[in-house]
Amino acid sequence: MKKIFLLTTAFVSLVTVLSAQYKYEFTVVKENPATAVKNQARTGTCWCFATISFLESELLRMGKGEHDLSEMYIVRHNYNRRIADNYLRRGKGNVNPGSLSHMCTYAVKHFGLIPEEAYPGINYDSPTHNHTELSNYVKLLSAEAVKNKKRIPAELQEGLFDAFLGKVPETFVYQGKEYTPQSFAASLGLNMDDYVEITSFSHHPFYEQIILEVPDNWDFGKHYNVPLDDMMAIIDNAIEKGYTVAWDGDISEPSYDFNKNSIALNCKDTIKNRELKNRVKELPVTQESRQADFENFTTVDDHLEHITGIAKDQEGVKYYITKNSWGLGRNGTGYHNMSENYVKAKTIGIMVHKNSIPKEIRAKLKIK
């Protein structure tokens, strides 16, 4: 009986060891205010959700209060711009949904803003956004326009967006006042010229504005190119000074796990949707390794999110607290933590307020 008891105890202990799970535990170092997590759902509009979230945090930082701004108003204007661009490029443009942060700030500067309650952008039978049909129609009409050598008639193009997103109100009432999109944007006090995009790739000269060669940069917007250490210093300084960061990067890695572990690590291990038995060893990152991954297409322009803070794990490793636009259903919070090495390796670009850039770097970039 004693032998059976000992064997049973040993078996239970073995099962316990085998089933043990390593859990990353985080302590917040600095977290800046952000609005509620939203859900882009079945759309390729992460660029807009991330940048609007970033601008909403800017309003909180500026003491302007909490506002829920309409992403679909911006998306609509972005589609109109890229349809025109594609036509003049004889069909060689990009009419897919993806874009970058500066396309959002361009739309705000030229077309204004609308609160979500005045333009939710869902004019079809769905509780969440779904642009599957809309995207197909945009591609079809764009191709026909090029084929016929004639732009899409304005009433047809606007009718398409009215059908899916709803008609844009000329005026609306918000918090007891009547606005147009332009007057509402002006009332918020945001200056789109204050926001700049930063990247770090060595095939371009540093401390100059460059055109980043990614498909979503269809309007050839410019990024300031800096060494990797400077880019990370900009992110850290922004968070420390109370700003947040719009982040564009690669999430196609098996080491990016939003759902189960809510963590992104720079490693070769597959951690996506898996229980972690041990702490994962990360790979170091250099300017050269980062460049190599960009040029062999390992690092690609996948997704935009919103960095709102910094945390450290139980071993003292730094992470960036990151707000996604996939709703709350996947992991309960809508946030996850990306390690410093992951951000070093997988960042395509960032958008920040120019005042959040360290003075010495800003001087080298000649940003006034």
Language-model features and meaning:
Residues 48, 73-76, 104-106, 115-118, ...:
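Structural recognition of the beta-strand scaffold that forms the well-ordered cores
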Residues 71-175:
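Papain-like cysteine protease catalytic cores
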Residues 1-23:
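Bacterial Sec-dependent N-terminal signal peptides
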Residues 43-75:
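N-terminal, post-signal-peptide region of Sec/Tat-exported proteins
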Residues 32-44, 88-95, 218-225, 234-235, ...:
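Second-shell loop/turn segments in exported
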Residues 42, 47-51, 55, 100-109, ...:
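Stable alpha-helical elements in mature extracytoplasmic
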Residues 21-32:
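N-terminal regions that are enriched for targeting/export leaders
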Residues 158-368:
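Active-site signature of cysteine proteases
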